[in-house]
Amino acid sequence: MKFCIEIEGAAVGGIGVHPGEDVHRHTATVGYWLGEEFWGRGIMTEAVTVVTDFCFENFPLRRISAEVFANNPASARVLEKAGFPFEGCLKNDVLKDGKLLDSLLYARTT
C-alpha cells in the first residue's frame, strides 16, 4: 500500500507499507521519502504515525518495522518520534554509492 504526501496540490513525498508473507504475514515494513525543502516540519513524523496507526487498526498486523541508513539521524528521529523503538544495528547492510553502510532497525508492535 502506497500513499502520496501532498501539500497544496503538489506531491512532496511518499510512504509505503509492505506486508510480510507466510510466517511473517503478521508483520510489515514501512518506507518513506520527503522532498528536502519540506524537512524539519514534522510532516514525515505525522505521516508515519497516521499510516502505522491505520495499518494496526485495519489489518491483522502485530509488528511494523523500518530501517534507516546509520548516517541519516533525521530519519531515525522520525521513527523514534512516531513511537518506533530502536532494535539494533545491521552492520554493512547496504551498499550505496560504492560504500558499505550500516542500517538501524526500528519497529513498533501492538
Regions found by a protein language model. Give the residues of each.
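Acyl-donor (CoA/ACP) binding surface of acyl/acetyltransferases
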Residues: 2-110
